Amino acid sequence: MDNNLEIKDLEKIAKKVRYNIVKMVGLAKSGHPGGSLSATDIIVALYFKLMNYSPDNPYKKDRDRFVLSKGHAAPALYAVLSELGIIEEEELWKLRRLEGKLQGHPSMDTPGVEICTGSLGQGFSAAVGMALGCRLDKLNNYVYVLLGDGECQEGIVWEAAMAAAHYKLDNLIAFIDRNKLQIDGCTEDVMSLGDIKAKFEAFGWDVFEIDGHNFEEIINTVEKAKSMKNGKPKMIIAYTVKGKGVSFMENNVAFHGKAPNEEQLKQALEELSE
């Protein structure tokens, strides 16, 4: 969005986004803070640095599109859209409430949300369809999609991966939020993903591995992916920390889908204010 933003600017935005994630989930007493915090830096880098996207015209036809396939991380997307001015900040504090507009998972009723997601794998499949549609419409844009690593245990992910390679969708850039935890525990204990890099390569994708909290790596890798016009979709495996930024949430599977209590909320907000 803004090529003039520096890494320090993105880090500042990400810290504010994390603060708002924890606050909104805490006030709602419900939600998924862990995976929202691990995904924050990727979403911030896309919207504030990499995507052709204007908050003043969020539905411009040739815009870049972002799909949050791991829809339970909706608080991260909402907080970013709020920083862009697309969602009013006051709406964040009504998350999951009847009087509010923000649901627990992304809904197309929400400004800036491209498609409803939450049923694991379906957002990824929809992103493949979007990329194909943009190609057929001869649009010079990109579709970005963020998956969870536990999400990759779903069969629909691999059907979509096969289709993306078949249709040579090099306008599709996907991320896996590889925090190695899901609701029932470690991904490798629940259903091992094995060598996920080799798997996507076998499906015909170009694959990169990065630190998902390093803005320089995120930006440079996306720019490299965009430069490779070789008919292959791109997968970026981003190694992240679940609950990033809050000491007692980091690598703690309990906070996959649990809100902090009042005492924990106070501590978390203090940490994110430092």
Curated annotation (Swiss-Prot):
Cofactor note as given: Binds 1 Ca(2+) ion per subunit. Binds 1 thiamine pyrophosphate per subunit.
Record bears the keyword Magnesium: no
Cofactor dependence: Ca(2+); thiamine diphosphate
Binding site for Ca(2+): 149, 179
Catalysed reactions, semicolon-separated: D-sedoheptulose 7-phosphate + D-glyceraldehyde 3-phosphate = aldehydo-D-ribose 5-phosphate + D-xylulose 5-phosphate
CDD domains, per the entry: TPP_TK (cd02012)
This enzyme's EC code(s): 2.2.1.1
Highest taxon of the lineage: Archaea
GO process terms (BP): organic acid metabolic process; sulfur compound biosynthetic process
InterPro entries on file: THDP-binding, Transketolase_CS, Transketolase_N
Annotated keywords: Calcium, Metal-binding, Thiamine pyrophosphate, Transferase
Coiled coil (UniProt feature): none
GO terms assigned for molecular function: metal ion binding; transketolase activity
PANTHER family for the chain: TRANSKETOLASE N-TERMINAL SECTION-RELATED (PTHR47514:SF1)
Recorded family membership: Belongs to the transketolase family.
Protein name, as recorded: Putative transketolase N-terminal section
